[in-house]
C-alpha cells in the first residue's frame, strides 16, 4: 500500500511539473539547430535578427513579420491545451486593443498538429467559439517557427525590436505588466 501511495504521489508531481511543457518535441528540432534554443527563462538575443515569416491567420489573412518593420512585435506562442496560455488570452486581447497608436503590435502563434495541438481545422472551429478577436492568431502549420526559435514549452514570448532584432525570449507565464515593461525597454 505504501509503495502505491509513493508511486501515485511521484506520478502526480511529475504531471504537475510538466503541465504545459512539451513532451512530444521532435528530435529533429532538438538536434538540428541547438544554437537557436533558449536555455534560460529570459534571454537577451538582441544581436540575432528575427527571421521573416509569412503565416496565415485564423481570420484567413496572411501576416508577414516584415509588414511590421519599424514597430516592436510581441509574439506569443501558445497551445489550446495549455491552461496557463488560456488564462492569459484576456491579457493578450487587452494588449492588442491598446496597441492603437503605440509602437508595438501583438501577434500570437499556434502550431496545429505539433506538440499535441489540434489539427488546423479543429483549432479554427474551437478558437472561433472564444471571445478574443483583437489579436491575430497565426497558424504555423509546418512548425517552422517552433524550430527556428527553439520553442519547446508554452507559453513562450518572443519580443522583436523595431529594427527586426530578436530582443528577448521569455519562457512561461508573463503578466501583462511585465509584457508592457519589456515592450517599453526594448528598442
Can you say where each PLM-predicted feature lies in the sequence?
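Positively charged n-region of N-terminal signal peptides that target proteins for export
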Residues: 1-4
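C-terminal motif of bacterial Sec signal peptides marking the signal peptidase cleavage site
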Residues: 16-19
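Bacterial signal peptide processing site
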Residues: 21-23
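N-terminal "domain-start" segment that seeds a small globular fold
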Residues: 25, 29-65
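Conserved redox-active cysteine motifs that mediate thiol-disulfide chemistry
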Residues: 77-94
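Thiol-based oxidoreductase modules, predominantly thioredoxin-like and allied folds used
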Residues: 103-118, 134-142
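Short, internal strand/loop/helix patches
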Residues: 123-160
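Thiol-/selenol-based redox modules, centered on thioredoxin-like
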Residues: 159-187
